[in-house]
Amino acid sequence: MDVIYRSGTKLIWSSSMNDDRQTSSEDKLKGFEWWRRSLQYRTGLGLDEEEKLQFEHDYRVKNLPQKCDSCIEYRDWMFKYSPSVKFMMEHVQKLGGNLSSKNITCDMCDGMKGGGFHPEMGILLCSNWIKDKWQLEDILTHELVHAYDHLKFKVDLTNLKHHACTEIRASALSGECRILNEIKKTGLGDFGSKFQACVRRRAAISVSANPNCSSKEEAESVVNAVWESCFNDTRPFERVYR
C-alpha cells in the first residue's frame, strides 16, 4: 500500500518493493569491493546513473533480516532510554495520540529515506537505510514531532506553508542538524550558520517533493515565508536542546 509521508515521497508500508533489478554478485556486496562502491556512491566520483541505481538497490537488500532486527532493537532501546523520544511520546499521548511498537514499525523503504509519518498508520522506520542507533533516535524524534504537530495544529499537508512549518520544526528539534553532524559533512566553514542552513535545506527538500509544489524555488520560498515563526516555535520543548 502506498502512503504519503513527511517528504511527500512515496514509501512502501510492506516488504514488497517495486524493484525488478537483480542484486549484484556476492563478491560485490562485501569486503574491499563493497567499501569501494560505498565510497564511490558517497563522493559521486566516477559513478554513472546506472551504477548509482544499482548501489541503492544492493544497499536496500544487503543483510535485510539483520537490519530489521537491529532497527527493532534500536527502537525498543529508544522507548526506554532516549530523553527526546520519551519526551515526545509523552506529549503525543497527552494530545490523544496512541503510538507504540504496534504502529511504530521497522520495514523496507523504496527510496533513500530514513522514515515517515502517516496520521492513520503511524510511524515507519526504514530499516534498510538506518545505519546506527543514534540515527534512528534522530529519525524517530523527527517523526514524533510530525505526529505532535498533526494533533496539536491540525497540519494540512496539501498546504505548502503547513508542510514547510512542520518540516522546519522536525529538523530543528530532532537533533539531525546538530552542529557536529554538519561539521562532519561540510567542514568548519560558516560555523555559526550551519544549524539553520541544515534545517532550511532539509525542509526545502521535503517540501519540494510535495505533489503541490511546482519547483525547488517555490519550496525554498515557502520555507523562507514561514521561517521565523516556525523555527522559533520549539513546542513541546522549552528550547532546542539537541
From Swiss-Prot:
Coiled coil: none annotated. Its EC number is 3.4.24.-. The keyword Repeat does not apply. PROSITE patterns: ZINC_PROTEASE. It is an enzyme of class 3 (hydrolase). Its main location: mitochondrion. GO terms for molecular function: metal ion binding; metalloendopeptidase activity. It is found in: Mitochondrion inner membrane. A divalent metal cation binds at residues 142, 146. GO terms for biological process: mitochondrial protein processing; mitochondrial proton-transporting ATP synthase complex assembly. The active site is at 143. Belongs to the peptidase M76 family. Has a dual role in the assembly of mitochondrial ATPase. Acts as a protease that removes N-terminal residues of mitochondrial ATPase CF(0) subunit 6 at the intermembrane space side. Also involved in the correct assembly of the membrane-embedded ATPase CF(0) particle, probably mediating association of subunit 6 with the subunit 9 ring. This is Mitochondrial inner membrane protease ATP23.
